[in-house]
């Protein structure tokens, strides 16, 4: 059950997710290695961790055709590998009534699909996302924008016949047939950042304290509606 509706004073219930008798538990294997260091009687600390995690029978909310009466079905769609590095540097400093605790952390996390259901090459999951072996989950799969047509003379004849004019967007014609359609979609980046981190500081003086926390991430793609 996934949705409800009131009609003529009566409560209704609608099914949005189809059942799956073949559904299996995910299976995961993970390896970790790390190091913890402390200097100057604990005033400075450093932690480093690395991990690799392989997941099989990956669970995913797979879209289903609207003609089925459902919007999605939970399926085992393939296998995935996650790997990453995490570093934390900490400081505990103080003198008299004053103390300062600081932590800086940064993480580099990657994932990629290593196998797909029924050996499919690609599985489209929405109008702008798809799953493909070797690509990260969370990748954008869409037609690539290249700029703006400055004049009608630039426009290929077939595209001009479709009503495209100067001032309209230029999209990359992947298959080279002068027709922009679903076959021209490609992977254009990932919503997953290359690295994330945070910087935390707590200052204390007698009965007063001040805390500040900053977070950051870099090089992830965003889609604007």
Predicted regions mapped to residue ranges:
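Solvent-exposed loop/turn elements at secondary-structure boundaries
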Residues: 1-26, 45, 49-80
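Extracytoplasmic loops and strand-loop junctions of Gram-negative outer membrane beta-barrel proteins
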Residues: 13-19, 68-73, 88, 179-187, ...
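Residues that define the transmembrane beta-barrel architecture of outer-membrane proteins
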Residues: 27-31, 81-85, 98, 193-197
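Residues on the lipid-exposed face of transmembrane beta-strands in outer-membrane beta-barrel proteins
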Residues: 33-37, 48, 87-91, 199-205, ...
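Repeated loop/turn-to-beta-strand initiation elements of outer-membrane beta-barrel proteins
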Residues: 42-46, 85, 96-97, 207-212
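Transmembrane beta-strands of outer-membrane beta-barrel pores
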Residues: 50-56, 91-93, 106-112, 205-207, ...
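Conserved small-residue
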Residues: 75, 94-190, 222
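Glycine-rich, aromatic-lined ligand/substrate-binding cores of catalytic
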Residues: 190-224
